[in-house]
Design a protein with these regions (language model features):
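A glycine-rich helix N-cap at a beta->alpha junction
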Residues: 19-24
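Alpha/beta enzyme core
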Residues: 1, 7-15, 28-154, 170-171
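Thiamine diphosphate
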Residues: 159-171
Length: 171
């Protein structure tokens, strides 16, 4: 966190009817959940709710992170389990989900299932590039439901690059 964010979270008691959410990324590869500075900053925000962003597109896992698909799942699940052990409500923000689903349906579905099994209260499906059309979003979510995924624990994080964020959120 930076000083401005820290000051904001220090004032959280002033917001009687709001639920603040600390946002950060999963632990980094090669670090434990207890020794990852970024994850520690999310915890130290003092919120009851945390949203973690993690990769759900195999291309980004292998090229941007330079790790295996299984190693990425371990980053996600261990981070979620750690936060749940601290009593946090956890939202997992599945970055590049819709592009990842189009490229490797099996892996993207496994990310959602593993995050939920690890204890994520919500899995938020991201149209990170903002290029999805409403039909694609609807068909993807229908596929997840057919795979036995609990739709009541799914959210959407639609970007508006093609002016479809509202339509995609309603799809």
């Amino acid at each position: 966190a930076n000083p401005i964010d820290s000051e904001f979270f220090d004032r959280k008691k002033e917001f009687a009817k709001s639920k603040l959410v600390a946002f950060g990324m999963t632990k980094r590869f090669g670090r434990s959940v207890e020794n990852d500075e970024t994850l520690a900053q999310v915890v130290s925000a003092g919120t009851s709710v945390v949203c973690l962003v993690g990769k759900s597109h195999d291309f980004h896992v292998q090229k941007a992170l330079g790790i295996s698909l299984d190693e990425n799942i371990e980053l996600i699940t261990s981070s979620i389990k750690h936060l749940k052990s601290l009593g946090k409500e956890v939202h997992f923000d599945a970055e590049h989900f819709f592009d990842g689903f189009a490229a490797n349906k099996k892996y993207s579905i496994s990310i959602v299932k593993e995050a939920m099994a690890a204890g994520a209260d919500w899995v938020v499906l991201c149209d990170t590039n903002g290029g999805c059309m409403p039909d694609q979003v609807r068909e993807t979510i229908e596929s997840l439901i057919e795979e036995g995924i609990d739709s009541s624990r799914l959210g959407i994080h639609a970007h508006n690059d093609t002016e479809n964020a509202v339509a995609n959120s309603l799809a």
